[in-house]
Amino acid sequence: MLLVGFVVLVMAVAVLCIAEYSSLPGNVGRVLTQEEQAQVIADNSPLTDYVMLSPNADFPRDDDITKITIHHMAGNLSLEELGSRFSDRDRRASSNYAIDSDGNVALYVEEKNRAWTSSDRENDERAITIEVANDEADGDWHVSDAAYDALVELCVDICKRNGIVEFTYTGDESGTLTTHRMFNPDTICPGPYLNGKLPALAREVNARL
């Protein structure tokens, strides 16, 4: 009887796993053709330089996009390296976009889908999440000027396409600009340097909306 119960349990888990994988969009977790990549970029930010769509997401998101949430990579990863990490189902992590230290932009989860980024489902249902590379480790977790400038450009683009008419930084989760540390007391993400730039980021973005 115990053996039968164990077999039934294993079969149930297998069915759930198969259902989870079969529910993924066909363009997720693989290298896209040029035509597929062009279509994905057309449906998201035209600033995108690299695409590797992660399976670690909810398809689609349940809420309208009303926020942008900033994170740091806690390292100077390439877009390909971060994409490889986000392709690992065991990590259960992803972001919508990332920016490397040269200012290049990657798309890992399409905007219509919820990335698993901020330790808060409610926020991520409403937010486009962006990881920014650090060109210096520890300390202030500095980010390059190129990465910061690209962040401004990407935030402007996201706001314009999604009808965010005012980009507000309030220092808490009530603003349209939020950060990882607002939802997880155990992290300093996005680091002291970038966190200190957020009021200026909001002003620069608003000046262009």
Residue ranges and their predicted role:
Residues 69, 129-131, 178:
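Soluble periplasmic/extracytoplasmic beta-strand elements of cell-envelope proteins
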Residues 97, 130, 151:
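Divalent metal-coordination and catalytic microenvironments
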Residues 1-124:
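N-terminal catalytic cores of peptidoglycan-degrading enzymes
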Residues 56, 82, 94, 116, ...:
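Second-shell loop/turn segments in exported
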Residues 84, 106-116, 136-140, 168-175:
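Noncatalytic linker/hinge segments flanking ATPase motor cores
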Residues 128-137, 182:
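Cell-envelope and extracellular/periplasmic
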